[in-house]
Amino acid sequence: MNKALFLCLVVLCAAVVFAAEDLQKAKHVPFKRAAICFCPGKPDRGDLWIFRGTCPGGYGYTSNCYKWPNICCYPH
């Protein structure tokens, strides 16, 4: 009985370690909370960020246009 309890504890600890590792990877993946938008003179679609004055960093945005009170950000 003692060995079975120890084995269960080892398996539980391993599961916690692997679950925590997956959560650390998930924190570094950028997640966009933007809608689709289009600006005059731009052939592609952009990302519409609601109630923002500037484009957020970390997404590779290089240009934008304002659609008050929102901003449309373009990655290329």
Swiss-Prot record:
Protein name, UniProt field: Kappa-actitoxin-Avd4d
Gene3D superfamilies: Anthopleurin-A
Family: Belongs to the sea anemone type 3 (BDS) potassium channel toxin family.
Signal sequence bounds: 1-19
Described function: Blocks Kv3 voltage-gated potassium channels. Reduces blood pressure.
Tissues and organs where the protein is expressed, per its UniProt entry: Moderately expressed in the ectodermal tissue from the distal and proximal tentacles, body wall, and oral disk.
Compartments where located: Secreted; Nematocyst
Gene Ontology cellular-component terms listed: extracellular region; nematocyst
Keyword terms, alphabetized: Cleavage on pair of basic residues, Disulfide bond, Hypotensive agent, Ion channel impairing toxin, Nematocyst, Neurotoxin, Potassium channel impairing toxin, Secreted, Signal, Toxin, Voltage-gated potassium channel impairing toxin
Principal location listed in the UniProt entry: secreted
Residue ranges listed under propeptide: 20-31
GO biological process, one term: regulation of blood pressure
GO molecular function, one term: toxin activity
Disulphide bond pairs: 37-72, 39-65, 55-73
